[in-house]
């Protein structure tokens, strides 16, 4: 079952039960314009609520654009896992075209405490040749998720 809420998140989030949400999918204000609605919401208050309502293996997914992407990522390095790039077919923000390039992508930041269910979307392609996952040591260069909290302490 999907429940959608429309309103101020700082009013709605406290009404949700603890550990009741599988996915938080959010497009917060980025604070990149002078518009009243584009004010950055206090991230510490949001994280307090998101961590309370999200199940232990729930995911918190945010759309963002620079410089907000960096602010958002730095606000919760402990739970930041990866970033996707949302490539757009046409650049946006034409009002600033004379002073900066059009924005052709947005960032999608994924946070979680415990690995959520992940169902990879496969596509048809030609298999790699010359090595296999059983003989390749490429996976050994990546650190585990637990290492992220070690980075926090330095």
Where are these regions (language model features)?
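Core catalytic lobe of class I
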Residues: 1-149, 153
